[in-house]
């Protein structure tokens, strides 16, 4: 008997975009084309219409099938690093105020606090725990409201009602 993690079945690969076949009534790849295959910098021409390219997919150029799937707005898929609309809390560490550098790990706490290191994050967690303990201990230390003391006849002492 082996200790540790149990064996898992291998992960089956899904079909990628290059393996999907589309029937778009375009000329087949077997038809002869020009010897010079143009490279296309943009999938749209100057007038906004889609440009069709007869280029070889194996050489890494754009393919007609892929160009026909592009939306007219030109919103091509981008990486998350391309978006500069990051929240203001992702610019600097919430504890030490260092700038958070793109490409480095960011440690999050409570969903809206970003930290440059796990140590800063841990320190903030400790500070929050101290605040929470202080809040929960504060109501117990409050003085109790007392009724005016009444002297019992014959004893001469005042007793406070609690």
From Swiss-Prot:
Keywords: Cytoplasm, Endoplasmic reticulum, Metal-binding, Nucleus, Zinc, Zinc-finger. Induction: Up-regulated in response to prolonged energy depletion. Up-regulated by the glycolysis inhibitor 2DG. Induced by abscissic acid (ABA). Residues 147-162 have a biased composition (Low complexity). Belongs to the FLZ family. The lineage of its organism: Eukaryota, Viridiplantae, Streptophyta, Embryophyta, Tracheophyta. Residues 25-47, 121-162 are annotated as: Disordered. It is found in: Nucleus; Cytoplasm; Endoplasmic reticulum. PROSITE patterns: ZF_FLZ. Early expressed in hypocotyl and cotyledon. Later expressed in old or senescing leaves and in pistil, pollen and filament of open flowers. Disruption phenotype: Reduced biomass and lateral roots and shorter primary roots. The keyword Iron does not apply. One of its GO terms (molecular function) is zinc ion binding. This is FCS-Like Zinc finger 6. It holds the Pfam family zf-FLZ. InterPro entries: Zf-FLZ_dom (IPR007650). GO terms for cellular component: cytoplasm; cytosol; endoplasmic reticulum; nucleus. Residues 27-47 have a biased composition (Polar residues).
């Amino acid at each position: 008997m082996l200790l540790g993690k149990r064996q898992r079945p291998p992960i089956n690969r899904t079909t990628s975009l290059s393996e999907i076949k589309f029937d778009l009534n375009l000329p087949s790849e077997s038809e002869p084309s020009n010897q010079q295959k143009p490279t296309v910098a943009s999938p749209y021409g100057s007038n906004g219409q889609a440009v069709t390219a007869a280029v070889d997919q194996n050489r890494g150029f754009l393919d007609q099938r892929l160009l026909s799937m592009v939306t007219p707005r030109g919103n091509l898929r981008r990486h998350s690093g391309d978006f500069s609309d990051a929240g203001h809390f992702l610019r600097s560490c919430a504890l030490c105020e260092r700038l958070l550098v793109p490409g480095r790990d960011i440690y999050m706490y409570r969903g809206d606090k970003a930290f440059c290191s796990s140590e800063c994050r841990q320190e903030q967690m400790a500070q929050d725990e101290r605040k929470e303990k202080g809040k929960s201990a504060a109501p117990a230390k409050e003085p109790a409201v007392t009724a005016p003391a009444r002297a019992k006849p014959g004893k001469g002492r005042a007793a406070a009602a609690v």
